[in-house]
Amino acid sequence: MLWKRWTLAVTIVVLQLAAVLLFARGFLPSRVLLPGYTESRVSTEAPFQKAIIMVVDAFRSDFAFSDQSNCPQLHKRINSGGAIPFTAHSTPPTVTLPRIKGLTTGSTPNFLDAVLNIAESDNSSTLANQDSWLAQASRDGRKIHMFGDDTWIKLFPGMFDDCEGTASFFVSDYTEVDNNVTRHIDTQLDQKTEWDVLILHYLGLDHIGHKTGPESPFMPAKQKEMDDIFDKLYNSCDDDTVLILLGDHGMNEVGNHGGSSAGETSAAMVFASPKFETAQLTETAETSPLPWTDTYKYHSRMDQTDLVPTLTALLGLNTPKNNLGVLVSQMLGLWSPEDQLNVLKNNADQMVQILQGQASRESDAKEVYELYDTLNSNPSVKDYYNFLYEAQSYLTHASSNYNTNDMLGGIGLGLLSTILALTVFSALTLAVQGLKRLYLIILLVYFISVFGSSTVEEEHQIWYWITSGWMAFLYISGSRNKFGDGFNWMFVQVFVRMMISWNQTGQKFTKKDDIVTWLSKDGNHPVLWILILVTYGVAFNKVWRYGFSKVESKLAFLLTLITTFASVGFKITQAWEAGEVVPAPLLYLMGLPGTLNEVNARMAGLARFAFSTIAAGSLYRVLSLAGTDKVNLIRDLHAFLTLFLITQSRIQNIPLFMVYYFLEIFLRKATNRSFIFSSRDIYQTEALFQKLVLVLSVSTLLLEQVSFFSMGNSNSMASIDLSNAYNGVTLYQIEFVGVLTFVSNWIGPLYWSTAGLSFLLEDHVRNAIFAKIAEKNNDVKLTTKLVQQALTLRVYVVLAFSSVAISAVMITCFFLREHLFIWTVFSPKLLYQFVWTVLQFALVDVILSSIFVVLVYRSV
């Protein structure tokens, strides 16, 4: 029976994976695009012959235009009329690859591009066969040179006459990655006849944001560096060259991006040329800098896709076939009144072709067609813009090409896995109907919450209340017989409250004060580092007592000291390199400061050494399985995992592991005292057994959810943390970076997953009680059987939740696929749930649990 249930568990996992893949195929298809290239020739004279495109990754509008920016040369050019500034709206997902697609083709990228964005070697997103302003320039015989982010080379293979790429995801480096671009400038400016378009894409500012946020002490210097480069390029321009400075997206308050907040969607865009100073393109003179505002709206507003028809018109190129951008009106002064109408006509004729491919005249696009018809008789500039903006709005918000059959098929498989998981779960918990009903209510509450955009954005609030309520229920039920037996639950609640208060997340309260904010304030850094060192002391004790417990005592102490010191040294060096305040004695201990290259090399070496010793110790412990030692395997591996997870954490989150440690202790004590020592039914094996397993399994599952959000995560792609994704990595390798990215963002769930296994399999009090039960029943193998059954029930607790969760999210995305927030709220939630389902629940909680069953309890 046991192995049948495990076979069914594997079947449920397969059903979930199939559901995810099938639904994704239907929900995330590529947008239908018009094939081919625009062939008609532009009849108007081009104001410029050359263009320099300077992309500063994550160049938020306030970095360029506010009184808090450090770009004096840019402000000077704006005030003189030589530069025309805009705040350019970046349509989510606000990550580099889809934004470059939008900036070159003029079309709105598919949300799947956000997933492909992290695959450095991915070629599925190439634009080699799509129309873009680069394709039009190349077909017109123009020469294009590109230096910087290698995403351009992946998107446009073979299109550059000269190029050199830099790795866009190696966020640990923000100096050399920009120097490798700047070193080409002098040569390129001296050889202007060799190119018609020069593209420079700088990544350093974005990397600083990922590492230390927009208020990093390194940010002003980086802005000044970009400003100096802009000034150098501007001074090299003649009246035939236009310089465009832009950000591909912005960043949020912590330096990440991918979501839809004002900071992430507000990028800087500047058109500059000496010709503008005499052309007087704007009616009123622009002034810069402007007062900082949290709306990030400065100067005129435009959509990023508007760059495409504007640039092609400025260079005398055809507008790409799938462009949804509108030529910015501020540039019209460069043409005669007659040519102004001609360039707008080109834009309108191109856009109406897309409209004809997506909607008939009898559809809801009828009013847009009527505006186009008015252009047939003496149209004015205003008439053209009326049509262009209405067409842009309609086409931008037009429905995606969903495959509803695949979506329904995925939902069907998800519901089937839910039915199977809940059926077996119910059969395994017949003796604890009350607890089972409460868990099912939790699943129902979560299922309902997924249908609200606000509850998805603030999901952490759901788990905070559910977890606190669950622990309160256990406190009440555990102290019915003797009040003192429930005393430990009070400490459990205290530490849960500390987890909740550690990081503010979500959308509504992200700027509210939390524990991390207090620890980061001036004057409080000594407290932070004391807590960090105490946490490392706790981790040292766990690794020494448990991780190297099978090694001779003195050698174990030495190995633990070396392993822990490597991790501590790495975090100290990483903090200093990121601009954090580090106490002088710790800097002296690590021989800091030093040159940047020395520090980076030292960091990589320390991280690799720490990882190697942790891996070696874990491998030794697995290979040393023998006799009764096997029952402590998970506890010992959990000690090594804790040190690894600390190494992968942000500095401010390291003390959370001390909170986890004490919560783990009190949760273990609370369950033992409340449900074993105080139990009146000590010999009622089934009821006691099911109660214990369900209490611990649900508790640790809830703590997985709470700990995920307590680390500062959310359901927004902007909260993905890349600051520890390159620890120990010197060259970009998607396999290692992918694993480290998952680990550094799922730290809490990984911790509580292994802690939950240890609770069930290796608690000596519980096993002693089970031994007594076995003795009472005259069955010497009953203890091992109970442990195996406990693991089985835990797996089905997880499968019940994961099946309900993925089904709920897929159903939500199906019925709300026309919702205003489908791409900004529900689609990111779907991607997060995919990761939860495939990596955390299926791989970690189910498959690894199965491996432990085989490794540790093979005797039955």
UniProtKB/Swiss-Prot annotation:
GO terms for molecular function: CP2 mannose-ethanolamine phosphotransferase activity. GO terms for biological process: GPI anchor biosynthetic process. Keywords: Endoplasmic reticulum, Glycoprotein, GPI-anchor biosynthesis, Membrane, Transferase, Transmembrane, Transmembrane helix. Glycans are attached at residues 123, 180, 672. It is an enzyme of class 2 (transferase). Signal peptide: none annotated. It holds the Pfam family PIGO_PIGG. Its EC number is 2.-.-.-. The keyword Ubl conjugation does not apply. Gene3D superfamilies: Alkaline Phosphatase, subunit A (3.40.720.10). One of its GO terms (cellular component) is endoplasmic reticulum membrane. Pathway: Glycolipid biosynthesis; glycosylphosphatidylinositol-anchor biosynthesis. It is a multi-pass membrane protein. It is found in: Endoplasmic reticulum membrane. Disruption phenotype: Defects in hyphal formation. Belongs to the PIGG/PIGN/PIGO family. PIGG subfamily. This is GPI ethanolamine phosphate transferase 2. It comes from Yarrowia lipolytica (strain CLIB 122 / E 150) (Yeast). The lineage of its organism: Eukaryota, Fungi, Dikarya, Ascomycota, Saccharomycotina. The gene is LAS21.
